[in-house]
Amino acid sequence: MDERELKIQFNSEIAEGDLNVRIAFYANIGFFIEIAQMLEFNLRKLICYHNSVTEIEKGEITKERIKKICEENDEYYFKTYKDKFTLGKLTKELKNLSILQSNVLDNFDEINEYRILVVHKIFQNNIVVNKFKDAKYVMEYTNQRLLPMIEKATAINKMVIKVIEAYKEDLHKYKNDVGIVVE
């Protein structure tokens, strides 16, 4: 195979007879999963920045104390990977912290439930009902379910990044105030 050739593998019975619809369906599933993974990554960061800043603000602001708090939250961050915290588990952590409003947290739940559907159930269910063979159905599903969830997940992720940036600015200010070099 030529190095410049691309090979795309998929189930040819999905959107049977319409290659463009099939490719769009698979591409959008992949993109949704990417966004959900980025949201999961950003929720880890949000929890750690929130915990660091709120803990710093509870007491005396000293170099040693800030270093200790940041180290503890760095450990927590790595623990979330080691213990395989999922989007659902991270959302539960956020609910316990009351960082965000409940309607925002509800969006995380919705995105997570849809992620579970896409990753674990959609193709299994299709074995029984076989709806995804019909290109028109696949196009409707993509336009009415998949693309709106991509848009929602993208918007929510952008909002989370803004909240992270606010916490990050506060944390960097506290670090600068006590002489900790911010990388």
Place the predicted regions along the sequence by residue.
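Short, hydrophobic, well-ordered secondary-structure elements
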Residues: 28-51
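Flexible secondary-structure boundary motifs
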Residues: 51-106, 113, 117, 121-126
